[in-house]
Design a protein with these regions (language model features):
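Helix-biased detector of long, well-ordered alpha-helical tracts
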Residues: 1-174
Length: 174
């Protein structure tokens, strides 16, 4: 699907920079933490049939405990200083929407390994019970970036206590 000029411009305005072929894709912060908290609150009674109350309480706190919301500005600046070609603060539509938006806005193709995406076990288990795709859940607090030398940047983020991983790479196709 090709976007019209105005739609493409609006999409590009959401993203800082543009992905370049050969960029490594990095996710900082566990995806779907915000969405997990929301569905846990809204489906609490159903989830109590499967999980202990303590587990559900912890799931509600995921964004504040593991999310990057309070560190977003720090991560944003670190990415800029490390030469990131593009940065995007995830939100509605989750991780998969973020991937599509960045690729479409940048005119590149990409490959991603879902097994590498930082995600909490609580999210996986709750989504499995509710038959929800965790990669489409609200992911506020997580950041998707494109950068050359992604492994070094991920190590830098991890030293700061931030959950992060190289999850894929861009190419010239789209």
């Amino acid at each position: 699907m090709k976007l019209g000029k105005k739609a493409l411009e609006a999409l590009q305005a959401e993203i800082d920079g543009r992905l370049m072929p050969g960029d490594e894709l990095i996710v900082a912060g566990p995806v779907a933490a915000e969405g997990t908290a929301w569905i846990t609150k809204n489906y609490h009674d159903r989830l109590r049939e499967f999980f202990a109350e303590r587990f559900l309480e912890d799931a509600v706190k995921l964004p504040e405990v593991y999310g990057t919301g309070t560190e977003n500005d720090k991560i944003w600046k670190m990415a800029e200083e490390s030469g990131a070609s593009a940065r995007y603060r995830m939100g509605e539509g989750g991780f998969l929407a973020a991937l599509w938006k960045m690729a479409e806005a940048s005119g590149v193709g990409l490959s991603a390994d879902l097994r590498s995406v930082p995600i909490r076990q609580e999210t996986i288990e709750i989504c499995e019970i509710l038959d929800v795709n965790p990669y489409k859940l609200l992911s506020g607090g997580s950041i998707l970036m494109g950068i050359h030398g992604g492994d070094a940047f991920v190590q830098q983020l991890r030293r700061e206590g931030i959950m992060a991983a190289v999850i894929g790479q861009t190419d010239s196709g789209n």
